[in-house]
From Swiss-Prot:
Pfam families: 2OG-FeII_Oxy_3 (PF13640), PKHD_C (PF18331). HAMAP family: Hydroxyl_YbiX. SUPFAM superfamilies: Clavaminate synthase-like. GO terms for biological process: DNA damage response; intracellular iron ion homeostasis. This is PKHD-type hydroxylase Shewana3_0717. The lineage of its organism: Bacteria, Pseudomonadati, Pseudomonadota, Gammaproteobacteria, Alteromonadales. Its EC number is 1.14.11.-. GO terms for molecular function: 2-oxoglutarate-dependent dioxygenase activity; iron ion binding; L-ascorbic acid binding. It comes from Shewanella sp. (strain ANA-3).
């Protein structure tokens, strides 16, 4: 399941974030790569311990945890804190699958979901599409600055070469309360249906019943 979430940050907020990020020191992006991925990756990143990157990462996580669509789709349990990358001058990241486990200062994170928050407007660079292969085929993603795409970490994906301009983004992984992607999809569809019926003032008893089904399935499938 691939979900696009528009306007996580406003244009003005993105501009403020970019001013801070652009002023930092960017390094070789292979510090987060596995052995296989490192042969396909050419980009730049901020150091994971950069204080500005850490501060903005906290802001991103807080914003996402307060976003109803993100919470409904991801059922987040634990984040691997956001990192920041930049592509320019032909830089690219060939097809790869993200590492299954990431280590943080607080322990291990199983990467159930990957997310990219775009921080460059699509008309300011050529190339740089996030191409994701999933059960519905190949999808090419290039969103407006401030918008985010969320997708299963099991997906084969790449960032195509940036042939002009500059593509800056935040990327992150998270462990979901529900490990299985198919179960997460069913819960998301059910939750979205409940919200839609609520907005349509559906009969109260039917909403109670559906909400009960949702929570009982979540109770059955969640791992905490």
């Amino acid at each position: 399941m691939l979900i696009e979430i528009p306007n996580v940050f406003s244009k003005e907020e993105v501009n403020q974030l970019r001013e801070q990020l652009d002023a930092r020191t960017w390094i070789d992006g292979n510090q987060t790569s596995g052995v296989m991925a490192s042969t396909r990756k050419r980009n730049q990143q901020l150091d994971k311990d950069d204080p500005v990157a850490l501060q903005i990462g906290e802001l991103i996580m807080a914003r996402l945890l307060a976003h109803p669509l993100f919470v409904s789709a991801a059922l987040p349990l634990q984040f691997y804190p956001p990192l920041f990358n930049r592509y320019q001058g032909g830089e690219t990241f060939g097809y790869h699958i993200d590492n299954a486990i990431r280590s943080t200062s607080e322990g291990m994170v199983r990467t159930d979901l990957s997310a990219t928050l775009f921080l460059s407007e699509p008309d300011t660079y050529q190339g740089g599409e996030l191409v994701i292969q999933d059960t519905y085929g190949q999808q090419s993603i290039k969103l407006a600055a401030g918008s985010l795409v969320l997708y299963p970490s099991t997906s084969l994906h790449q960032v195509t070469p940036v042939t002009s301009g500059e593509r800056t983004a935040a990327f992150m992984w998270l462990q979901s309360m529900v490990r299985d992607e198919g179960q997460r999809r069913l819960l998301f569809q059910l939750d979205q249906s409940i919200q839609s019926l609520t907005a349509q003032a559906a009969p109260e008893q039917e909403l109670f019943n559906l909400t009960g089904v949702y929570h009982n399935l979540l109770r059955r499938w969640s791992e905490l």
